[in-house]
């Protein structure tokens, strides 16, 4: 399966709790931190919820 590199580009300060939890569930902690995860429907759904806060690249 393909891998995705997700980078937190905007801060979660002032965002709703659900968006903060989603960012945390993706494994992102600080602004500009990145994680590489497997591409699957669950991860894609999480990315869609916080798409305005993250950037995604295919690896």
UniProtKB/Swiss-Prot annotation:
Q: What CDD domains does the record point to? A: Ribosomal_L30 (cd01658)
Q: Name one Pfam family in it.
A: Ribosomal_L30
Query: What keywords are assigned to this protein?
Result: Ribonucleoprotein, Ribosomal protein
- Determine the domain of life of the protein's source: Bacteria
Q: A Gene Ontology molecular-function term?
A: structural constituent of ribosome
Which InterPro entries does the UniProt record give? Ribo_uL30_ferredoxin-like_sf (IPR036919), Ribosomal_uL30_bac-type (IPR005996), Ribosomal_uL30_ferredoxin-like (IPR016082)
**How does this polypeptide assemble, per the annotation?**
Part of the 50S ribosomal subunit.
Q: Which NCBIfam families match?
A: rpmD_bact
- Which HAMAP family would you find in this protein's record? Ribosomal_uL30_B (MF_01371_B)
Family designation: Belongs to the universal ribosomal protein uL30 family.
Name of the featured protein:
Large ribosomal subunit protein uL30
């Amino acid at each position: 399966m393909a891998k995705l590199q997700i980078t937190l580009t905007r801060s979660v300060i002032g965002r709703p709790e659900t968006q903060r939890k989603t960012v945390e569930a993706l494994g992102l902690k600080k602004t500009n931190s990145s994680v590489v995860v497997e591409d699957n429907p669950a991860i894609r759904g999480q990315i869609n919820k916080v798409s305005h806060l993250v950037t995604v690249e295919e690896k």
